[in-house]
A protein has these predicted regions:
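Short sequence motifs at beta-strands and strand-loop junctions characteristic
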Residues: 49-54, 88-92, 141-148, 181-183
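Cleavable N-terminal export/targeting peptides
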Residues: 1-25
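Outer-membrane beta-barrel "beta-signal"
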Residues: 182-195
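Outer-membrane beta-barrel pore domains and translocons
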Residues: 17, 33-39, 76-78, 114-118, ...
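Short glycine/proline- and aromatic-enriched beta-strand/turn motifs that initiate or cap beta-hairpins
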Residues: 19-65, 71, 194-195
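Outer-membrane beta-barrel translocator domains and adjoining extracellular loop/strand segments
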Residues: 40-48, 82-88, 122-130, 177-184
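Extracytoplasmic loops and strand-loop junctions of Gram-negative outer membrane beta-barrel proteins
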Residues: 40-44, 133-139, 171-173
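Gram-negative (and chloroplast) outer-membrane scaffold detector with strong preference
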Residues: 63-135, 147-149, 157-163, 192-195
Length: 195
């Protein structure tokens, strides 16, 4: 039911943008972003609390509808390294996005939502022989797909009309996740190329 309401809301925003402007499609933009942040959470079943700063990369592509609305897609991968022994929690996610932006001088603040999905995997190595290609004595591995809602806030800085710097803050929500995935805020920095 929630998915249907979110889809209807996104379609409503798109058509309201179309009704506001005579020239509906005002171009497109896209770019790459690096991110970090702080994630924490307990992984049930193995009793491990994962926390720390993830590192990741991804990108976005959007169509500009009217003066303020943009729709498109984005995708990212994020890795949270643990225990300094090769242990990790990794996320890959993406989806369709809609956002509202408003230019104020050289700044373009924006807010939006991405709806999609992804996959999370984790490898926690509790003990291994210490030798390269050594045998693992005690390790846990898990992998799971998830439905993703990703609300975000950001701001672009217009270097030129074709090149913008962007900074974005989000919190990836995974409703209905079966095992406790670490979550928390992420901050993104990157370039957006406009046409």
């Amino acid at each position: 039911m929630k998915r249907i309401l979110i889809l209807i809301f996104t379609i409503f925003l798109t058509f309201s943008a179309i009704g506001q402007e005579k020239k509906v499609l005002r171009g497109f933009d896209g770019g790459m972003m690096l991110h970090t942040g702080y994630l924490s959470g307990k992984i049930p079943g193995i009793g491990f609390s994962a926390k720390g700063a993830p590192l990741g990369i991804g990108g976005v592509a959007r169509l500009c509808l009217g003066s303020h609305f943009r729709v498109g897609g984005e995708g990212y991968v994020s890795t949270l390294h643990q225990l300094r022994n090769g242990s990790y929690v990794k996320y890959g996610w993406g989806g369709l996005l809609a956002d509202y932006s408003h230019r104020i001088g050289r700044f373009v603040p924006y807010a939006g939502l991405t709806i999609g999905g992804g996959s999370a995997s984790g490898l926690i190595i509790n003990e291994f022989s210490g030798e390269e290609w050594g045998e693992l004595q005690d390790a846990s591995y898990g992998k799971q797909a998830f439905f993703a809602l990703d609300p975000f806030l950001g701001c672009e800085y217009v270097l030129t009309e074709r090149i913008h710097l962007t900074a974005k803050l989000d919190w990836l929500l995974m409703p209905g996740k079966a095992w406790g995935l670490p979550d928390g805020p992420r901050i993104y920095f990157g370039f957006i190329f406009c046409h």
